């Protein structure tokens, strides 16, 4: 009897995580002589533990499955669930019993750092149980903070969204003749990759965003005041971009200056509010108009500004995962290997998931100016290829068409 595929999505959604899902489904269906049915976890490993899954082979037979590539967020539904550290916990018995009942031979988990932790634990339990199930991680995160890969699916589209949206914000913020400051808060708890993309919004006629602050460089309120004062001497309207996770020299988040931060299911501090805090600070110190803007969810899941390059690479990563599993690989994550020899090109490799999970790739310090307020041209060379091409969306009655999510079925 042919072994079946089980695929899940976990963590924060992106504009292209469903492209990776499409890649897994397509490659699985293409290998009909080796693979039986493709199943999907509904709401990740947490939902699967509750008995929620979907037959994706049937979906592919009856619906335009390629529409996944223009559907944002997580088609299968997501979760933020940590498997127990104790590999002897009964939850693993339940999982592997269910795998056996469903004749699962290959498990693919699409996600970021914590999702790779899930792949690591499952592959280690498989060794203990002498199971031949193969577990492969497919990278996903707008934060671009996974180690051992040039970049991650989702980041290119977020960078494109940030740059495009900032260009429009800048035009709006600078159209008045009176001094003003606009502070844009972007995602990024410990790594500033998302905020760095704001530099792409600059034009030959405007240097805005004039100041860019990221978690990798300690934030100082007095230095911020001096830098903003200097910027206002050069520009009537100044746009400032900040990562949600900017912190002072003592490691205290700027958002905590106003309120204590909440904690999510993984124990990570939920950071919002540094933009609003800085807005009030600027109003008090400078006495000029100031507003703060949180780009919030659209920066991670807007498909209308998705990068065609990102969509294509995400799909290929999903396909590469199936190929790797069929070749006998397990406990690995698909990696992106850049080759700039003859222009931009990405090759797909593999890395041990244990070398990836619970580690974090920070934005390179050498790509941040000494005063911590700007980004170097090296980053621009790095990111430009990732944002190329435009998503071709489908429309009905003037609004985008998406594939109906699994959790609504």
Which residues does each predicted region cover?
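Glycine-rich oxoanion-binding loops at beta->alpha junctions
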Residues: 51-105, 114, 142, 153, ...
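Gly-rich Lys/Arg/Thr-decorated short loops/hinges at beta-loop-alpha junctions or inter-strand turns
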Residues: 4-7, 68-81, 140-150, 177-180, ...
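N-terminal phosphate-binding or glycine-rich loops at protein starts, especially the Walker A/P-loop
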Residues: 1-53
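Short glycine-rich or small-residue beta-strand-to-loop segments that form or flank ligand, phosphate
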Residues: 4-14, 74-80, 105-111, 137, ...
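Accessory alpha-helical/coil subdomains and C-terminal extensions
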Residues: 98, 109-111, 117-126, 130-132, ...
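Short, ordered loop/turn segments at secondary-structure junctions
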Residues: 10-12, 41-46, 80-81, 112-113, ...
């Amino acid at each position: 009897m042919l072994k079946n595929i089980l695929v899940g999505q976990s963590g924060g959604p992106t504009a292209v995580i469903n492209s990776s899902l499409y890649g897994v489904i397509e490659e699985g269906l293409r290998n009909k002589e080796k693979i039986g049915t493709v199943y999907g976890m509904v709401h990740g490993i947490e939902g699967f533990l509750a008995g929620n899954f979907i037959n994706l082979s049937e979906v592919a037979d009856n619906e335009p499955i390629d529409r996944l590539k223009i559907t944002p967020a997580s088609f299968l539904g997501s979760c933020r669930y940590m498997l127990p550290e104790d590999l002897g916990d009964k939850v693993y018995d339940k999982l592997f019993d269910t795998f056996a009942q469903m004749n699962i031979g290959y498990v693919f988990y699409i996600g970021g750092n914590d999702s790779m932790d899930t792949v690591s634990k499952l592959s280690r339990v498989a060794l203990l149980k002498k199971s031949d199930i193969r577990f492969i991680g497919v990278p996903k995160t707008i934060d671009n903070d996974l180690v051992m890969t040039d970049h991650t699916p989702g980041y290119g589209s977020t960078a494109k969204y940030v740059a495009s949206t900032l260009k429009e914000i800048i035009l709006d913020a600078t159209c008045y003749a009176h001094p003003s400051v606009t502070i844009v808060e972007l995602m990024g708890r410990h790594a500033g990759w998302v905020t760095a993309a704001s530099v792409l919004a600059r034009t030959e006629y405007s240097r805005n965003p004039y100041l860019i602050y990221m978690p990798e460089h300690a934030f100082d309120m007095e230095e911020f005041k001096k830098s903003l004062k200097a910027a206002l001497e050069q520009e009537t309207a100044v746009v400032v971009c900040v990562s949600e996770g900017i912190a002072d020299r003592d490691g205290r988040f700027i958002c905590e200056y106003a309120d204590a931060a909440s904690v999510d299911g993984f124990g990570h501090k939920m950071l919002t509010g540094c933009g609003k805090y800085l807005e009030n600070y600027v109003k008090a110190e400078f006495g000029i108009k100031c507003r703060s803007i949180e780009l919030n969810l659209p920066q991670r899941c807007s498909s209308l500004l998705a990068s065609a390059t990102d969509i294509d690479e995400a799909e290929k990563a999903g396909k590469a995962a199936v190929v790797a599993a069929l070749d006998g690989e397990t406990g690995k994550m698909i990696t992106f290997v850049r080759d700039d020899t003859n222009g931009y090109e990405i090759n797909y490799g593999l890395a041990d998931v244990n070398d990836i999970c619970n580690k974090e790739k920070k934005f390179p310090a050498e790509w941040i100016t000494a005063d911590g307020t700007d980004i170097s041209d090296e980053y621009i060379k790095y990111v430009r290829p990732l944002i190329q091409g435009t998503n071709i969306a489908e429309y009905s009655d003037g609004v985008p068409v998406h594939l109906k999510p699994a959790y609504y079925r």
